[in-house]
Amino acid sequence: METNPRKLRSYSYICLIVCIFVLVVCAILSRAEEKEGKGENDDHIPKIYSILVEGEPLAFRASTNINSKAMALEAKKIEEIHDEILGSTLEKGSYTKLYSFKHVINAIAVRTTASQAKKLGKTKGVKAVEEDKGVKLMTTYTPDFLELPQQVWQKISNEGDRRAGEDIVIGFVDTGINPTHPSFAALDLTNPYSSNLSRLHFSGDCEIGPFFPPGSCNGKIISARFFSAGARASGALNSSLDILSPFDASGHGSHVASIAAGNAGVPVIVDGFFYGRASGMAPRSRIAVYKAIYPSIGTLVDVIAAIDQAIMDGVDVLTLSVGPDEPPVDKPTVLGIFDLAMLLARKAGVFVVQAVGNNGPSPSSVLSYSPWVVGVAAGNTDRSYPAPLILDGGQTVQGVGLSGPTLGAPLVQHRLVLAKDAVRTNGSVLQPLTRDIEECQRPENFDPAAVFGSIVICTFSDGFYNQMSTVLAITQTARTLGFMGFILIANPRFGDYVAEPVIFSAPGILIPTVSAAQIILRYYEEKTFRDTRGVATQFGARARIGEGRNSVFAGKAPVVSRFSSRGPAFIDATRSPLDVLKPDILAPGHQIWGAWSLPSAFDPILTGRSFAILSGTSMATPHIAGIGALIKQLNPSWTPAMIASAISTTANEYDSNGEIISAEYYELSRLFPSNHFDHGAGHVNPARALDPGLVLPAGFEDYISFLCSLPNISPATIRDATGVLCTTTLSHPANLNHPSVTISALKESLVVRRSFQDVSNKTETYLGSVLPPNGTTVRLTPTWFTVPPQKTQDLDIEFNVTQVLNKFTFGEVVLTGSLNHIIRIPLSVKTI
């Protein structure tokens, strides 16, 4: 018998490997069986689906009176067809109909199982079935930053903000509105709103309910509805949070509405501190509310129902600071039901504005795809709220936090205590150091005598990254134990973190950079005495927190915000680039003040406050909605495409220093030159957008031709989605008459055409120039032209590949007019 120890160890090792291999295989097989079993059981879990049905919706039928008896009969017929489709296809008791969409889209929302939805997909009269993926939510200074009082409101009326936005209705699909907020009051008896809504070509309704009593629709708010069938069907509604009325329990919808349409000159006072006066972009515009998002749940079918109703009511502008959680996986992005609803809104003459999302700075992170909607990116202004921590000895460390100074400032310094040095002990036994101690999450962790009257240093750790820890918990701990103040420093193990100004009820500062945190910790250790066990026995470090509520205006602006989603837009689940520029435009979206709602269900730290400072593309979007309303007011005959063109072609691509707009990326301390996939056409310039000189018109038929020209999408698919045949196609998708040119795969050469319409009242001569994207040459034909008022002029743009780069590069066409109009057309090209 072999007894060599080395060989025995070898055999044992082989046996061990075999055993591990067998266990791993068994685990994989078990996991696969479990997954397969779950897949089979998933069919018993009802989900929400949107069913696109053949037939034209009511808004696009011959009759123009949507409220006539004839149209009411047509609406009834459509609903009967919907019921027949469901009743004849699905098993009794296997479904719940949530909505019959009849106005701008012909569709059904239904809750049923996957197998039943599959049956519907094969039913005659059904064009498409789409599973509901859910939806998510995507100023005292910005009117001045955009020069509205000086350059825009006075051009519209010599009464300025008293008429800016007059008779324009902006619709908001969001979380509702706080009807008692002063931003939405109608108390100016010297400038009352007309009660005659017929002259606005608008017909809405005011649905009363909890916290939304009669009288909530006051002339400023002219319509308010809520949509909850999808939310109810999801089973996720929380009766204590999700108020079934147009009332905004979260604050988001009120914030968005105030940015676009809030009253002018509203004092922003929080915790007794005056931050300035707020105004919407179009302060005299009317507000129509369509609540479709709740604190606990948001479903796409509720959003579609809200869009459908908004178009029927007759809004001029539609603001969508919401969007699907993710793109459709089984169809082109531009043919998802959300994008189709926006296409039909555009067909109805509504200017639609959509947030591109907050998934930046990753490429192809936009959730806006289609050329018929304006996708808005978010930028920083030059306003900031620095919060200083002044160490004993005079060194100042800058942080972030909207709070007042510590008691006795600027003369009195207070003891600094690191949270882990103030842990409650059990006799001589030290409490084990845990994450929630470092993060100051629970008052019972601390020795009250050590922290009372002290500035406590808390550490940003993994609890904040996994959302188990909150700044609110720190403030509650501070209040319970009587902290003089607190600091939340970056953790060297995790690196820098992103900090936004937060309104603190007690003095507090966020220190988001490791370098600044190390300055504080180094000073602290120099002044702290420890015993042989490392336990702090004497705290010698002193500091004070300075005033953090005063704004400072400095630095370059605008800058593309880190969170703002980036292009290119894509057409399918593989993220193949789409020949459409997204985002379209950049607008202020960082640290924006706006109205809030007292319950603040989304953010408890803001509970009880009437104003909030927030960041997001949700905040950028209403800026463009309000500016669109001003353009519509000045040019009531303009189509949505003309308004979008005016905003795009007049945008600024340079910042306050005269340099190309910069963008934030992953590194907190650095800025990088931005490109069209960061900022779109550039930062909105409202004054120039009011008088663009030339615009690029496009209509519903043009968008259908664009769809029909997209590769790998059959005419049948287009017909099923839109109800329109592909009678004409473009030679290339980039030939859509759009205020930008995006070519996702340029081989050898391509000529695209743009058709401009003069919208001034004087003949003007334009001279063309080109900054070609790298790897191309670009030629214009003609190189100059003269166009009379209201006439059109075609421009051919010829691209030739000089180098295959297999990546997007960027340039622009510039048309300089003899009457000082300047039109910029962004170019984004990938040579292959």
Curated annotation (Swiss-Prot):
Entry superkingdom: Eukaryota
Effect of a null allele: Seedlings lethality when homozygous due to water loss. Mutant seedling grown under high humidity can survive and show small, crinkled cotyledons and fused leaves due to impaired cuticule formation.
Keyword terms: Developmental protein, Glycoprotein, Hydrolase, Protease, Secreted, Serine protease, Signal
One GO MF term: serine-type endopeptidase activity
Any GO BP annotation: proteolysis
InterPro entries for this protein: Peptidase_S8/S53_dom, Peptidase_S8/S53_dom_sf, Peptidase_S8_Asp-AS, Peptidase_S8_His-AS, Peptidase_S8_Ser-AS, Peptidase_S8_subtilisin-rel, Peptidases_S8_3, S8pro/Inhibitor_I9
Entry EC number(s): 3.4.21.-
Signal sequence, renumbered to the chain: 1-27
Compartments (UniProt record): Secreted
Domain Peptidase S8: 150-690
Active site residues of this protein: 174 (charge relay system), 252 (charge relay system), 618 (charge relay system)
Domain PA, chain residue ranges per copy: 425-524
Glycosylation sites per record: 196, 238, 426, 761, 774, 800
EC primary class: hydrolase
GO terms for cellular component: extracellular region
PROSITE patterns, A to Z: SUBTILASE, SUBTILASE_ASP, SUBTILASE_HIS, SUBTILASE_SER
Function: Serine protease required for epidermal surface formation in embryos and juvenile plants. Involved in embryonic cuticle formation downstream of BHLH95/ZOU.
UniProt similarity note: Belongs to the peptidase S8 family.
Name of the molecule in the record: Subtilisin-like protease SBT2.4
Protein species of origin: Arabidopsis thaliana (Mouse-ear cress)
